[in-house]
Every structure is written in structure tokens, then in C-alpha cells.
């Protein structure tokens, strides 16, 4: 009886081995090992153990874009160049103002006006326009249709007049213009000329000039004419002094001790001594100056010119043109800011 019993056990053992091998070779069959997995559902198994191909798919490196392949006869197409950005100002202002003349490196008007515009919250900007020729003023106005006005400095204070529509009465009398108002009317442009140099001179130097009776005006340019107009208004006798002398204009060689003693006011209306040539000064006999003399310089840069310095060394009172520049600028803005005319 033992032998048949052993045969039966052997058959059962072989069947079990076969079943185990079948389970190992077929992992999708979930009937094997269900007792050791407890009550875990198929859904929970899938959540805890994602498929192997999904795991590898999620961890694969991203595919690189294939680079173009070119044969020897095929050249790569050039990348299109970006269109250049248009050159535009950082801000478009409602109104433009400026200064015309040549040279303009010495001028401080742009800094002063733009500070004024910022402080007063005025939508405007002031630029320097250095013109090679006064004829370029027409191109300037065409280029900037929002140009509302401009100042004029050397050497164009008299040359600008033929380009103006009209002059105000004072500018007509002086024969020089330092302020122009630009009006746009009925599709056209009107240029009206004014002179605020004489206003600036009067307000800046008027108090110092009290008690003086005779003045020498060095130079015969546009600002010289404005100074003469102001001195005439004050009742101060005056004479021009120039290298080009004639019956009415004295020469520098005529400045004798007696002449220097007679004229106790000397006004420098030349650009001599203006920045950057700060070591230069008009050729007058400074040794004849004394404490009774008053030297006035319309130059605003530098604050103290060599003309002023030499005058002070001989006891004279001296004042520069910085305040005069500010006063004439205030008068110019009042003209530009008026509505109509």
C-alpha cells in the first residue's frame, strides 16, 4: 500500500510545480498569491504600481529637434535680419522751444529752461539748434511742426530779421532780435521777432547803473544795440567801441586816460572771454580803471570773466551776465506763453 501512496504524492507534487511555473511565466494571472496580497483590489494595485512602460515613458529624455542637414550643394538660408527700430525721441512733447546760433557749447539756456518746464509741470522741451547758416532756420521750422518759439544768439540776432513775418515795436527800434514766436495760422507759419535782451539788461543792471552818466559799449553786434536802447531809456549817454571805428564808433586805440576817466561805465558786449576762452578779455587799458568805474559783462558763462576779474583788481565794481540771461529768459517765456498775438 505504500507504493501506490508514494505515486499519488509524486503526481500531486509535479502538478503543483507545474502550476507554480505557469504563474511565474504569466504575471497577468492574478489568481496566484491572492492570499498573501490580502484584500487589496485591482484598482489599488494599479495605483501603487504603474505599468513599467509608463514609468520609462515618463523618465525618457525629451527628443531633440533634428538639426537641418545640408548637402554640399545646399546652403543654409540666412536668418532674416530684424528690421531696425525707428529712431524716435524718448518722449514726444506738446511744444518745443530752443536756441539758434553758432557756436552753442557755452550756452546754459537749455538746462535752465528744461528745469523750469519740469518744475512747472509744463509739457515742453528746450533744445540747442546750432545752425551752420541762418538760411537753415526755414528747414528747422519745417522739421519741427511743434516748435513754438526760439531764442537767437550770436551771430544771427540781426541776420534773422529778413526771415521774420514782422517785428514788434521795440525790436524794430533796436534793430536786433533775440526771441522769435512761431504761430501756426490758416495752414501757414508766422514768425514774430522780439527783443528781450534790453529787458534783461535793465532788470539785472538797472540798480547798479543809478548815479552813472556815461557808458562805453564794447562791440557793435545785436546785444550791443539792445544795451544801447536800454541805456538810452535810462538817460545814460553812451558810445560804441569797436576795432572797426568811424565817426560815430570809437576805436580801442582812442581809450586814453581822459576818455576812461570821462566814461565810468564799461559794458562788454563782445564774446571775448566767453567759455571756453576764459583767459581772454577785451583790449582796454585796465590800468586806467579806478573805484568809480562799473564794469558790466553780458557773458553768462563763466560767472566771472577775465574782464571782470581785471576790473576788480583795479578797484572797479563788476557784475556778469548770469542774472541778465535769466531775466531775458523770463521775458521770452512770457511772450511764448501768451495766447495769440
Question: Where do the protein language model's features map onto the residues?
Answer:
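Acidic, proline-/serine-/threonine-rich low-complexity intrinsically disordered repeat tracts
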Residues: 38, 42-47, 53-91
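Short helix-loop-beta connector
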Residues: 209-214, 290-291
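N-terminal signal-anchor transmembrane alpha helix of single-pass membrane proteins
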Residues: 2-24
Amino acid at each position: 500500500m505504500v507504493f501506490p501512496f508514494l505515486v499519488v504524492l509524486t503526481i500531486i507534487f509535479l502538478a503543483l510545480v507545474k502550476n507554480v511555473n505557469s504563474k511565474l511565466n504569466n504575471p497577468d494571472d492574478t489568481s496566484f498569491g491572492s492570499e498573501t496580497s490580502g484584500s487589496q483590489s485591482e484598482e489599488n494595485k494599479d495605483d501603487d504600481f504603474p505599468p513599467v512602460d509608463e514609468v520609462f515613458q515618463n523618465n525618457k529624455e525629451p527628443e531633440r529637434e533634428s538639426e537641418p542637414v545640408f548637402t554640399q550643394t545646399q546652403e543654409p538660408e540666412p536668418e532674416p535680419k530684424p528690421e531696425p527700430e525707428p529712431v524716435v525721441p524718448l518722449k514726444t512733447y506738446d511744444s518745443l522751444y530752443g536756441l539758434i546760433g553758432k557756436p552753442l557749447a557755452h550756452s546754459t539756456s537749455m538746462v535752465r529752461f528744461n528745469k523750469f518746464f519740469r518744475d512747472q509741470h509744463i509739457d515742453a522741451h528746450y533744445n540747442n539748434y546750432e545752425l551752420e547758416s541762418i538760411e537753415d532756420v526755414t528747414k528747422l521750422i519745417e522739421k519741427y511742426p511743434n516748435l513754438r518759439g526760439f531764442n537767437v544768439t550770436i551771430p544771427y540776432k540781426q541776420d534773422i530779421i529778413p526771415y521774420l513775418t514782422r517785428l514788434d515795436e521795440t525790436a524794430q527800434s533796436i534793430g536786433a532780435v533775440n526771441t522769435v514766436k512761431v504761430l501756426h495760422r490758416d495752414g501757414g507759419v508766422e514768425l514774430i521777432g522780439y527783443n528781450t535782451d534790453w529787458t534783461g539788461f535793465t532788470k539785472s543792471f538797472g540798480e547798479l547803473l543809478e548815479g552813472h552818466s556815461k557808458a562805453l559799449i564794447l562791440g557793435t553786434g545785436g546785444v550791443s544795440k539792445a544795451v544801447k536802447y536800454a541805456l538810452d531809456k535810462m538817460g545814460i549817454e553812451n558810445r560804441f567801441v569797436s576795432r572797426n571805428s568811424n565817426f560815430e564808433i570809437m576805436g580801442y586805440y582812442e581809450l586814453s586816460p581822459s576818455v576812461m576817466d570821462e566814461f565810468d561805465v564799461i559794458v562788454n558786449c563782445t564774446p571775448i572771454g566767453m567759455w571756453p576762452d576764459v583767459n581772454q578779455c577785451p583790449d582796454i587799458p585796465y590800468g586806467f580803471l579806478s573805484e568809480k568805474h562799473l564794469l558790466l559783462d553780458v557773458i553768462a558763462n563763466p560767472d566771472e570773466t577775465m574782464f571782470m576779474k581785471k576790473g576788480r583788481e583795479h578797484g572797479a565794481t563788476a557784475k556778469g551776465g548770469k542774472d541778465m540771461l535769466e531775466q531775458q529768459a523770463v521775458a521770452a517765456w512770457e511772450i511764448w506763453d501768451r495766447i495769440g498775438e
